[in-house]
């Protein structure tokens, strides 16, 4: 049975959700349709970093007014990618400040001459603060490095004879106590040790602060009266799937809406009209997680057709949205998907790879998903920021469950709990929910990772932040990931699921694996006794250098990583029979961090190397995850790996 607050949110949810999201406008993923076109702007862009002492030469000289090459030497920079690792310039790799991107785009004639066409520039991710100009005219600004933003540039490209447009984007990767993630700038004033004006960026998170245009940049079109946003929520009544929809239209008041829901064979299973309604699907195929059902990840297609009357005549807009029918609920000791107990056995990840940095890359993405399925993982957390939209789409298609996390990592300073920080964090959650609300794979929001939640302002901060997120989306539980003491954590009372990180026999009691079982069991018992909420072991692991071997195991050897995991698993197997509902290894793959004596070319806690090659622990974890899958499958039947036919153990 749902707890009291959950029941309240369930009752108020549809009204609050619609109101919250209606305030901001939509962020539908740009899909081609009979009424919509898109033009990718990925490839080589002109690039220049502003190395001036105050980092503002580009603004003082107005580099955006003329082609960037006229301002001085430029580099070719691939988009999407981080700029840090592409070149051979040591200064550029660690650069902090403004960098400038530019691209000329040739537009189809119909885009520039048809005043009934709306032309939109969409930037998937620009880390961290971005200012955008088109043909020297300011069109957009955006704070935050992990979520998309757009600008309607129709008037600029339809106002003259030009069939092209010059897009200039200035990006600043500086982090302050009020950004997400936060950081500080340290100025070194001792001129006997440092040059005049020398400064460094300090951060309180353990991954490299890659920067640039990390995700696709594109142009797309819609009619001037268009489908701006769609919000769906799903439920199940016996064998009937219920799809509640709300459609938001911009650019006109006189229109009709037709809605059809198609199954995977293209058959219409339900239809409706109007901007709000409910579709009933008899004998619905539910969206199930990978390995939980013999037919996981079933997706319907919601086809929306808008017909509007304008001064120029009748116009139409079409948009198709993938829909998975499923429910999520939390009890005192279970996490339920479609009313059945779900156990998270998965990983934490990073968007990180050689050369690309955090740049989106299709081959890498497909490789990662093949490894997840080989591993038998059914879930991951987007540690520690929202991932690319294309990642979320593959999770929907493959049935990989997602804990969708905001970039609220490293919130450890009192200044980062200010009203300024809180307001920005609230806006980030609005953007995240607006983007990912319709993904069936997303089953829980995480508003932060390892904040200093014992600080006095943390209670009000997380109470407000979690309540706001629930108002935006009451259909999903909300959490944050903690490493604070259970007695001191001021944010834990407001979460639906306790997510706790611990590194026994790694960051303390070095090498003493014999204490893991006692310490881990005590951790679980303390948290559950205090809050009576389900618990996920959201991080655990050990750094391992691939090829290092030592028996008896020593730290950094492959044997130590495996031995540490085995000690955790003994306790997890006991507690998952009670109230532990998941385990997520840290980390899926090795990743880059800042340089320090504690890091050897990055964090090495991956069960795969940064090049996606398995360490010994990957095989250990694979055996465990496939056995867990067989124990938790519904309806029960033995499953076999889709990625490896011959296996040394029973799958």
Swiss-Prot record:
Signal sequence segment: 1-22
Main location: other
Tagged with keyword Acyltransferase: no
InterPro entries: Beta-gal/glucu_dom_sf, Galactose-bd-like_sf, Glyco_hydro_2, Glyco_hydro_2_AS, Glyco_hydro_2_cat, Glyco_hydro_2_CS, Glyco_hydro_2_Ig-like, Glyco_hydro_2_N
Signal among keywords: yes
Keyword field: Disease variant, Glycoprotein, Glycosidase, Hydrolase, Lysosome, Signal
Gene that encodes it: GUSB
GO molecular function: beta-glucuronidase activity; carbohydrate binding; signaling receptor binding
Catalytic activity annotation: a beta-D-glucuronoside + H2O = D-glucuronate + an alcohol
Localization in the cell: Lysosome
UniProt lineage: Eukaryota, Metazoa, Chordata, Craniata, Vertebrata
Pfam family, one: Glyco_hydro_2_N
Glycosylation sites noted in the Swiss-Prot or TrEMBL record: 172, 419, 630
Organism domain of life: Eukaryota
GO biological process: carbohydrate metabolic process
GO cellular component: extracellular space; lysosome
Disease implicated: Defects in GUSB are the cause of mucopolysaccharidosis type VII (MPS VII), an inherited disease reported in humans, mice, cats, and dogs.
Assembly with partners or alone: Homotetramer.
Active-site residues from the entry: 450 (proton donor)
Protein name: Beta-glucuronidase
Organism: Felis catus (Cat)
Regulation: Inhibited by L-aspartic acid.
UniProt-listed Enzyme Commission number(s): 3.2.1.31
Family assignment from sequence similarity: Belongs to the glycosyl hydrolase 2 family.
Gene3D superfamilies: Galactose-binding domain-like, Glycosidases, Immunoglobulins
The protein's role, per its UniProt record: Plays an important role in the degradation of dermatan and keratan sulfates.
